[in-house]
Amino acid sequence: SIPLEWKQQTPLVSVIMTVYNAAATVRSAIDSVLDQTYRNIELLVIDDCSSDDSLAVLKAKAADDDRVRVLQTARNSGTYYAKNVGLSFARGAFVTFHDSDDVSSLNRLELQAQALASDTNAIGNYTRYQRLSEKGREIWLNGGSNRPGYITLMVRREAAIEAVGYFDSVRVSADAEYVERLRTATGREVRLLPVVAYYALQAEGSLTTAGAGAFVVDDQGRAKMPPVREQYREAARRWHEKIFDGESSAVLPFPLSERPFFAPEEIRPEKRGRIESE
């Protein structure tokens, strides 16, 4: 049960959702955030230059609920660039993330926020997630039906930005890099909570099923990491070693003007545009 004093003093949680051509799914994603048992939230939705009706859907949601704030990028730059836009506008003591084609358990934010508030040794936490087919069936990968979900990462906003700055603005794999950078730079825990609280829809065209960064899944449900992700992960690991040894700063500014480590050309963002706010 949640103590009375916790209910009376709940910190503001900023939820950052990036959107690109997700008009068909973003309503349910937004509703799963707004319907959370944890009520003290702001939802920042960042449209990454969608060509469908996503922006109109977002504006309609914002008109119905003043907890929703709509931001726009003027040029498509990828989900982690858009997440950084959200981070730069966020006001919450805690900040977390949500994709535009997924849904959360209705108590996800309450579970994570309470765990983080009561765990002074942790700078963040995340939950497990279940990947589902478009028909709602569980998808098994590498022998498991659920996996650690970095998309659910919740951090102490000011402490995290002071320690490591922002996400690397590449198009894939920057969430795992961010978590490991937090651990390396701060020596504090980013805890995996042993609960499935997030459900990801496996749709065609997602980051994990399309493009250079796509995972290849065989008939037995075994997923193989693509070369560009392996190259990026190894380059990030070497950079983290330098951070640990005190040879490099862990802070990535936003926007990023000079890379501290290698990223394959295929996953780098295009030229960045201005930011517009509703």
PLM features: what roles do these ranges have?
Residues 1-277:
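Nucleotide-sugar donor-binding/catalytic module of glycosyltransferases
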